[in-house]
């Protein structure tokens, strides 16, 4: 090959090698960034419901390895996209709202899940439908709370709960086991079945409300629970002013129910969902 031809061949080969190198060093195409994990439920853990009621998706099921299938209704504001932390509210119903009474029956029997929306429009509301008011349901409530705290963008300082009647029994057991999961608790027309010491240790504010002549429980168990927590706080050295910020005892007289058209003090517990002083206290914590 002549010198000139050899030179041209060398230049051509070098140019081809440079071109191949440029192609191989080009940045690979970028994959789209997946949405944050907190914006949607884990499909492997949850079967989503297909029915709705006034903004709630009904009969979702959390499949817990330890606690079995946990049925719940949930309201997630349309504005929630996982980019900012939202509050979280659990409302546990009385006997008439348990799962065997029918899907969504708790939302038809009680208004807590609806009136709560007036206090914070950036709040996810969970309305479980459990099967009893004992240890099993308490453990399922804890598992459900842990699921929402782990899979949604939740402000840990704004995690609220109420329990009405049997739901209050369940929620008091939860408070006796894992009070640190919650910011404040509203105990309505019920009795306290859980331990007291964990509540005192965690300094969880509790509001007790019941009719003075509640037909199912009477007001005595509520008074006793308040007194027990109060005594423990005194032992801890808290002042009355400090205790008053953590404990509220609100025993309603007969007129409270009669004036609002309720013939029953126990059944009239749903009135508490519409009481701005009570609900305002909960969501003001």
Segment roles from a protein language model:
Residues 1-39:
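Gram-positive cell-envelope targeting signals
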Residues 23-88, 169, 174, 234-245:
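A domain-start/cap signature at the N-terminus of enzymes
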Residues 79-84, 133-165:
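Gly/Ser-rich "nucleophile elbow"/oxyanion-hole loop immediately N-terminal to the catalytic nucleophile
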Residues 86-88, 92-142:
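Active-site machinery of serine-nucleophile hydrolases
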Residues 104, 218-235:
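Short alpha-helix in the alpha/beta-hydrolase fold that links the catalytic acid
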Residues 121, 200-206:
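Short, proline-enriched alpha-helix->beta-strand connector loops that line the catalytic pocket
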Residues 151, 157-201:
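Primarily recognizes the serine-hydrolase "nucleophile elbow" in alpha/beta-hydrolase
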Residues 209, 213-215, 232-285:
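C-terminal catalytic histidine-bearing segment of alpha/beta-hydrolase fold enzymes
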């Amino acid at each position: 090959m002549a010198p000139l031809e050899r030179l041209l061949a060398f230049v051509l080969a070098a140019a081809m090698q440079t071109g191949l190198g440029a192609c191989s060093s080009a940045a690979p195409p970028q994959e789209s960034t997946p949405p944050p994990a907190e914006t949607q439920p884990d499909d492997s853990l949850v079967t989503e419901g297909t029915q709705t009621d006034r903004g709630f998706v009904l009969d979702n099921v959390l499949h817990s390895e330890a606690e079995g299938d946990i049925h719940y209704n949930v309201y997630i504001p349309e504005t929630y996209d996982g980019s900012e932390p939202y509050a979280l509210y659990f409302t546990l119903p009385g006997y008439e709202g348990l799962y065997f009474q029918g899907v969504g029956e708790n939302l038809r029997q009680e208004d807590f899940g609806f009136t709560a929306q007036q206090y914070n429009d950036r709040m996810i509301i969970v309305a479980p439908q459990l099967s009893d008011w004992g240890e099993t349901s308490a453990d399922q409530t804890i598992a459900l709370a842990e699921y929402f705290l782990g899979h949604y963008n939740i402000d840990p300082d704004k995690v609220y709960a109420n329990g009405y009647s049997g739901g209050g029994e369940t929620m008091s057991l939860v408070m006796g086991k894992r009070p640190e999961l919650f910011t404040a608790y509203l105990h309505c027309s019920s009795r306290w079945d859980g331990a007291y010491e964990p509540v005192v240790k965690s300094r969880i504010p509790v509001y007790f409300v019941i009719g003075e002549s509640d037909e199912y429980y009477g007001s005595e168990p509520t008074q006793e629970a308040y007194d027990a927590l109060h005594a423990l706080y005194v032992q801890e050295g808290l002042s009355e002013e400090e205790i008053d910020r953590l404990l509220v005892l609100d025993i309603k007289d007969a007129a409270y129910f009669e004036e609002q058209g309720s013939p029953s003090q126990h059944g009239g517990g749903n009135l508490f969902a519409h009481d701005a002083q009570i609900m305002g206290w909960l969501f003001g914590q």
